[in-house]
Amino acid sequence: MAKQGKTPNEAFGGDARSGPGISSLPRQLGSLVTILDEVRSGTSRTRPELIASTGLSRAVVAQRSAELCASGLVEEAELGASTGGRAPRILRFRSESGYLLAAELGATSITVALTDLSAGIVDIHEEPSDISAGPHVILERVKALFDELLERHRDRPGQLWGVGIGLPGPVEFSSGRAVAPPIMLGWDQFPVREAFASRYGAPVWVDNDVNVLALGEVRAGVGRGHDLVVFVKLGTGIGAGIVVNGHILRGAQGCAGDVGHIRVTDDPTAVCRCGKIGCLEELAGGRALGRRGEAAARQGASRILGEVLAAKGSIDAEDVAHASHQGDPVALELITDAGSLVGGVLASLVNFVNPSLIVIGGGVARAGDGLLATIRQTLYARSLPLATRDLLVQRSALDGTGGVIGVASMVADELFAPHTLNAWLDAGHPGVLSRLDRVESRA
């Protein structure tokens, strides 16, 4: 474990004042960040490609790329392909220059990771948890897991540049605080960002878990190459994250995509944990599947679910999914009903934002092909033909890593955004951001 009072930068063998020497660079941040983004993403890998993709002049590209190389953020690598004349050098983002800590908190699990500056996973750990235990218990556990990651990699070169947290509820991104989260008792307005910034000497960003899952899918999953992606998490709750041109669409306050609380019935008995009536999450979320499956088992309607109930005393969504895989008609009906409700809500979303890809993830998404088929069938039946002509609906393939990849990607994007880069240029290291009262974040 890292010693108390010792910053992660010291644990990594660094000093908060050291790092890339970009404090001496001129303040033409627009072109500098444009080139850095192109190189970071791999969109452009040589100076001729940068000139073609950005529209910047040869002189500006030469100067900014030289400054980035001098800073240590970018380096010249092997020769690229020649298009006539001398072959250009490939420019490579030095993702090993620093490290990021990322945590995805779900309703029933914690996943933490140490990554490089390109969100490449260096080390990862997942364990069961219960978000209802409250922020003090959960965040202390996250800190302990972070400390273990840092201790295991204390001899690696580089410094900690940022920390990111994904929470399973509405998050006001500008403040980094959950706001009236339905399943997170005690988390409302809790200062999550401050709890980590003072401990780790690095800037901290907090976002909704579905937003970062969506970003992770775009950066490392089936969403690569798509301009408008909707990620739908079907877990204990239901939510959607929207990524447009590589950036999370958060809305004015950060709650864009909260489809789990769209009303799908007027039944007064369908009271959601948010306090409202008839929410999608109350009827089609993991908690609802478990509740309905247990009711069926107690009524003797399902032999398979009845055996599970007798063995463990309760039924959850995973049990319903397993029963559906075995052909249990009751479980299959429950899965089909949930898929129809989800597909109906997504049809409205498709008509509204016209995505090219919808990715289905979360624990309930592992219920099998029947769920995905029902979602597709309902969605296509209720959406406009033009909106679905080229639409793909696929299951996530990231298998538990998408959240932390998305968290780390979000942190890296914020670190190298113009407004943030400008705030730490003079210090030469982003650790200075942890001492600022507030870092303006993109909504």
Where are these regions (language model features)?
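Glycine-rich phosphate-binding loop and adjoining helix at the ATP-binding site
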Residues: I124-L228, G370-A381
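Hydrophobic "anchor" residues
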Residues: I121, A178, I248-L249
